[in-house]
Amino acid sequence: MLGFTYSFSVWRGDVDPVFPYISAAGDNRPEACMFSMFLNICSFLSMLIVYLRYSLVAELNRSSDLLLKSFNRLNLYAGLLGASGMFLVANFQETAVIQVHLFGAFLCFGSGCVYMLGQAWISYRMYPLFSGIRIAKIRGVMAIASVCLFFMAFGFGWAAANTFHSVFPDLPTPRPWTHKLVPMPATICTVSQR
């Protein structure tokens, strides 16, 4: 779905085709309308998938493991919180309200990392009856990589903004960061979460 927005943004020359800054693809009209619509659909589908996974684990567990039952419910909240962050990113474009947009992105990716770690733990906990050790290990590796990349993206973005503002204190942070490798960790983090 979002590939359409990306393709349209590249065709119009609004983003760099190699390393696009994700929010820049949905910042100008008409891309902003398509970006919001498709990301809202993705957010709804993410909520649905999170709830279906919660229901599956709850049904397979059927109160036989109370710790797993409680943790599954907490992980449901983390997943729904991440999808809600995606709604914020979709509906508050970067140039409109940057604080809400960045909060939504942080919520989306941060809660997504927590959700992935939780799913990895649930898979380990459900082994050997309902989950294979291979899928549990794959989920664990992907979750740890996602957390590392999330902190790298956050850290490098913060450092880049501080460095820029130490030299140019009166200028706003330049956006979008196209034709630079700054959004690369965020892109890797996004890909690793799917």
Task: Annotate each language-model stretch with its function.
Residues 1-58, 71-85, 91-94, 103-124, ...:
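Early transmembrane alpha-helices of polytopic membrane proteins
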